[in-house]
Swiss-Prot record:
PANTHER family recorded: GTP CYCLOHYDROLASE MPTA
Keywords: Hydrolase
Catalytic function, reaction form: GTP + H2O = 7,8-dihydroneopterin 3'-triphosphate + formate + H(+)
Keyword hit for Transcription: no
Descriptive protein name: GTP cyclohydrolase FolE2
Native organism: Dichelobacter nodosus (strain VCS1703A)
Pathway where it operates: Cofactor biosynthesis; 7,8-dihydroneopterin triphosphate biosynthesis; 7,8-dihydroneopterin triphosphate from GTP: step 1/1
Site (May be catalytically important): 149
Amino acid sequence: MTETAIPDVQSSPDKRHIAINRVGIRDLRLPLFIENAAGEAMPTVARAALMVALPHTQKGTHMSRFIRLLDLKTPISVSALPTLHQKMLDTLHAEEGTISLSFPFFIEKSAPVSGEKALLDYEVVLAVDGNRKHVEVSVEVTVPVTSLCPCSKEISQYGAHNQRSHIVIYAQYNPNQPFSIEDLIHIAEEGASCPIWSLLKRPDEKYITERAYEHPKFVEDIVRDIAMVLNDDPRISFYRISSENFESIHNHSAFALIEHQK
């Protein structure tokens, strides 16, 4: 009995001759290990998007090949993104493409006075985009912080309104230089009135309250202070910073954004 060959429809020619910029899979949820600055493998659950350009001559891409690209046992580092991108292009026989991984990233933080330890989560997006000759690698972090209003402090006899804020930093960097997720998180926290912690005792709360009061900042101050740090960082070629204060005395947020191509 002769076996009948199964048709490979997606590899057949396409008569419309229209190229597709990106085709692939998105919102693929899977467990991964992310390498932190200390070289440790941190477990998380990521949402992945993997896409390539499709030439006008080809009907479809090989969707099943995207799934095999991500090795669930090997930790993914920021520095490994260009290699993963090249592997995707080779596997899909493509000339350009994009990979994006979004996930919660946990850091064990010690409370500022008591030293009590607990995990704090940050939203992170790692991405690489480009062709066989040039790629752009980016890291985006969303960092929760505390902000305290300078105007409120100035006009009040005691106290000042403060609130939780989100700082988002998106940075494209030189893949040939060492760079970590924690680098951007640290820059964001230093740019706020005060960082936040998951576990605090009374001495820690006193410290946070007083530190925020001593470092009042508008959203404008936050993004400008962070921009000054990123301007001096030779590893970064482009950045976008935003700060959103979830105002405690209003039913709206305050927002500021700076982006800069070096």
